[in-house]
Structure formats: C-alpha cells, structure tokens
C-alpha cells in the first residue's frame, strides 16, 4: 500500500469511523501502529500511536510535551495559526503546561479533587442524582420518552462543578449553553464567542472574591487566595477554572452516557450488575476501557526527534496517543472486544497516564458510579427507544459520546 493510499485508508477523523472507530484501530495496530496522517484541513502531520506500550511510553516521555513555546519559532509557527478555538485562549493550565509550571499548578489544584474532598461530595452527588431520577420517573409516568443525556448526564456534572467552584446554581443554564457552543462550533466564531463569555464570567467571579475575601470556602475562593499570595497568576487562574469546568463537564457527561449505552447493548452484563450491584465500580472501569469518552490524549509535540518502534517522529510534529486503541490491545487485555464488567485486572488508560493523568478522575468516577448504578436500580425494565445504530455520536474523536440516549421506561 502506498503512503497516500494508507493515509486515506487509516484516517480516524473520517466520518465513517465516528460511531465505531474500533475496527479501524484494530487494523492500525496490526498494519500501521505508528501512523502519520496529514490533516485534510490544516496540512499538519499527526502521528497516531495505537499500541498500548507506545501510548503509555509517549505519555511518560519528557521529549514529548504539550507546550508549543518549547519548540523553535519556525517549528511552532505552523501550529499557532490553527490555535484559534476557544481553548487556545486559555492554555496556561495543568492541561497544557509541562513541568515545572505544570507541577506547581497541579500541586495547588489537586487537593480539591483528592479522595477526602470527593468523599465529602459523594452524598451531594447521590442527592442530585436522586432528584434527577425523580424527574425522569415523572416524565415516564406521563408516557413521555426520557433522554439519559438531557435529563441525567448533562445536568449532574454541571451542578457538581458549579458547587465545587462556588458558582450560583442558577447559572447552570449559561454553563450548558457555552459548553454546547464550544463543542458545536470548534475553530469558528461561535466557539470564540462562547469561550470569551465564559472567560468574562470567570473573571467577574474572581473579582468578586477579591472584593469579598471572606465570602466563601469554595475552590475558587482558595485559588483566589493563592493568586493574592503570588502562587498563581490571573491568566493561570482563569485558564485553570475554564478548563476544569469544560473538560470535567464533557468527560463525565459522555462517560455516563456511554456507560448506560454499553450496559443496554450487553444485556448479560446488565443482568449481572443487577444481581451484583457492587460491580458498578468495575462496570465504570470497563466502560472507560471498552469504549471510553476520550478517544486520544490531548495533542503532544515532539520536542526532539522521537523514536517509536521502527518509526522516527520528527521534531515539531504532533503525537496523538490513541487511548481507545491502546485499551483494546490484545497484547495487554485478553478478549479485548468483550465488554466484561468483572474484568480484573483492568489497566486501562481511559483517564490518561503519567503527570497528565486526569485531575478530576476520582470525581468523574463517583458521578458515573452513582448515576449509572442508581438508574439501573431505579428503572429495572428500561430499554433503548431506538436502534443503537441510529444514535448520533459527536464528530470529535477527542471528546466523544452520544448526543441523545432515549429510553423507554414502562409505567
């Protein structure tokens, strides 16, 4: 196969792979585990890594980083001209920085997502989920179709993250609208407009905390205190809040949606979970492995020529570790295409690996376990209202999920 033919054949961004990219990733692991693809719109070279060891190694390699300014200007220039989406406005945060700045910021923020804080939020998550399920039950009793995404997966993380940062609950509709705009209009005017409004909102809330430092004991108040003491800059503060709200929201929404979908697509595993509710934790982990909400890690840059297997990735080109592909590598996972909620061990990379392991993983897990487990318990006779093949998936391989998940719940 010629290089150009292979590029056409192995293009994970092609529309036909959106709903189910796994057959393509199986072929790539076997035939082109380190695959160079030139973006059709941007002309930039992306290197897709699909084998578990290569993905894991790339996420640990100090010669592969996230900060574009660590490259010479001539190598960085082709990438900068495409950084026009809303996320480009706010890159001074743990998601986009390398050590030592990454280490400093993560040390400030990580305690808010640690085991103690997450445990203290668990009862609140249960309360919110209970209220959302009550609303779903009322709609079902009236004969209406219910949508897991719209009525459970979307509102839950918005409410939880707003409470964590001390944002007014009544502003949740604004967060939702901004998030939808940023996802719908990537690299466009809508994305920039929504991102700017979100940034302005965060800046206003920071100013309010400075004016009334005694007002709250939430995460934003604690970070504002760090800004006052010089531990974090204003740009880093705004950027960190922006990314935590946006990334935490979308990842959790999609994890809940995909988790429910996979259980309904695998009735034997759903029955197993109903018989043994304590398997809800492993069920969430298996969702992260089998069909996780994050397709690939955030783009990395080769800071020097990087050898991966027999290939050499030139300095300045983009490295994309494909988490979905690594998580079905048969060299690591027996029967990788089987959805098994009792899988043990399960060393998936669904939340990443190394210094950029997902900061909010513990909180996302609590929300997913509570939402999915409570839904299964509350509505034992629920079923999909449409054929799974008719579900619409988001078009982005990075943050992926179904747009709607309609259920039938017998009255």
Identify the function of each model-found stretch.
Residues 1-411:
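Cytochrome P450
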């Amino acid at each position: 196969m010629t290089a150009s033919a292979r590029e056409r054949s192995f293009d994970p961004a092609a529309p036909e792979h959106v709903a189910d990219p796994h057959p393509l990733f199986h072929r790539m692991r076997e035939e082109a585990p380190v695959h160079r693809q030139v973006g059709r719109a941007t002309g930039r070279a992306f290197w897709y890594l699909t084998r578990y060891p290569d993905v894991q190694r790339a996420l640990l390699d100090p010669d592969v980083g996230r900060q574009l300014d660590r490259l010479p200007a001539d190598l960085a220039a082709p990438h900068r001209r495409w950084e026009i989406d809303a996320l480009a406005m706010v890159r001074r945060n743990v998601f986009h920085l390398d050590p030592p700045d990454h280490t400093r910021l993560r040390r400030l923020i990580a305690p808010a997502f640690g085991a103690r804080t997450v445990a203290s939020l668990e009862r609140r998550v249960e309360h919110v989920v209970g209220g959302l399920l009550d609303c779903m039950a009322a709609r079902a009793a009236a004969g209406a179709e219910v949508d897991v995404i719209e009525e459970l997966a979307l509102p839950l993380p918005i409410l939880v993250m707003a409470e964590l940062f001390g944002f007014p609950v009544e502003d949740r509709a604004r967060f939702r609208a901004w998030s939808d705009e940023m996802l719908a209009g990537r690299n466009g005017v809508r994305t920039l407009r929504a991102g700017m409004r979100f940034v302005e909102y965060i800046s206003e809330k920071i100013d309010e905390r400075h004016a009334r430092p005694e007002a709250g004991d939430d995460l934003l108040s604690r970070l504002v205190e760090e800004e006052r003491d010089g531990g974090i800059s204003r740009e880093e503060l705004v950027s960190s809040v922006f990314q935590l709200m946006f990334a935490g929201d979308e990842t959790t929404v999609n994890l809940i949606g995909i988790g429910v979908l996979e259980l309904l697509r695998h009735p034997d595993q759903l029955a197993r979970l109903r018989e043994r509710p304590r398997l809800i934790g492993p069920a969430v982990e298996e969702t992260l492995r089998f069909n996780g909400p994050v397709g690939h890690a955030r783009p990395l840059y080769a800071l020097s020529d990087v050898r991966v297997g027999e290939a050499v990735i030139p300095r300045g080109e983009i490295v994309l570790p494909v988490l979905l592909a690594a998580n079905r590598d048969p060299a690591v996972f027996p029967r990788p295409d089987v959805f098994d909620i009792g899988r043990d061990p399960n060393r998936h990379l669904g939340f990443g690996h190394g210094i950029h392991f997902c900061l909010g993983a513990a909180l996302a897990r609590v929300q997913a376990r509570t939402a999915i487990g409570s839904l299964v318990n509350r509505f034992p006779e629920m079923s999909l209202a449409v054929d799974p093949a008719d579900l619409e998936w988001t078009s982005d391989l990075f943050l992926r999920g179904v747009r709607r998940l309609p259920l039938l719940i017998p009255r």
